[in-house]
Amino acid sequence: MATIKEIQQRLELVTDLADPFLAEAANDQRSGVQKAIEKRKRAIQAELDEDLRLEQMLRYEKELYKADYQAIAGIDEVGRGPLAGPVVAAAVILPPECKIKGLNDSKKIPKKKHQEIYQAVLDKALAVGVGLMNNEIIDQVNIYEATKLAMKEALSKLSLKPDYLLIDAMKLDVDIPQESIIKGDANSLSIAAASIVAKVTRDKLMADYDKKFPGYDFAKNAGYGTRSHLQGLERSGVTPIHRKTFEPIKSMYE
């Protein structure tokens, strides 16, 4: 009779719930074997669920490939709401049928997974572009217009010219066919890829600013108006990266 460890090792090779070995192993009544079977079944089901989720997130891209578009760029931004720092946009062109496990709206990805998924996007993407508009531009033109400028800059930095754009809840005045998708980062894999690139890029910038302007907790709050950030403003005042048209900073200048 095989040991429990040997059966566990064999189960690790099973990738299909219909694999005959699962039924065969189920005849072994040892609790260690039964637990190992259930664990492996859960893992296989999780893989199937993840593949289905990713397949759903490719539905926009697949329709466009059918319409003979070849280079589809997903575009998203991070940083519209913070009191400090830039708004960062990214544009990403993924190859057809590209599925990156765990890729989702960056707000739904655990922080400990950000770097890993960001790197997977960089490794698999056909092209990646990043655009940034600092707080001074945000104050000059407003955050909505600055976001569009950042997206257009990200688009201009792609090494491959896209023939279609999928954009998260935004329209751009560029001469490329496009679709604006509400909650696009949760519904399109290309937009989700842009979301994580923009998120990791901006978080790194804010961590660097935290060293330059200590006392505001930028590395943790990314410039959002958390208690520690507001306490820093009360204690030390406004830094050169704060948005002067955003409250409560605006009132400090009146």
Swiss-Prot record:
It comes from the Bacteria. Manganese or magnesium. Binds 1 divalent metal ion per monomer in the absence of substrate. May bind a second metal ion after substrate binding. InterPro entries: RNase_HII (IPR022898), RNase_HII/HIII (IPR001352), RNase_HII/HIII_dom (IPR024567), RNaseH-like_sf (IPR012337), RNaseH_sf (IPR036397). GO terms for biological process: DNA replication, removal of RNA primer; mismatch repair. Keywords: Cytoplasm, Endonuclease, Hydrolase, Manganese, Metal-binding, Nuclease. One of its GO terms (molecular function) is RNA binding. It is an enzyme of class 3 (hydrolase). It catalyses: Endonucleolytic cleavage to 5'-phosphomonoester. GO terms for cellular component: cytoplasm; ribonuclease H2 complex. The keyword Metal-binding applies. SUPFAM superfamilies: Ribonuclease H-like. The keyword Metal-binding applies. Its cofactor is Mn(2+); Mg(2+). A divalent metal cation binds at residues 76-77, 168. Residues 70-254 form the RNase H type-2 domain. PROSITE patterns: RNASE_H_2 (PS51975). It is found in: Cytoplasm. Its EC number is 3.1.26.4. Its main location: cytoplasm. Belongs to the RNase HII family. Endonuclease that specifically degrades the RNA of RNA-DNA hybrids. This is Ribonuclease HII. It comes from Streptococcus sanguinis (strain SK36). The gene is rnhB.
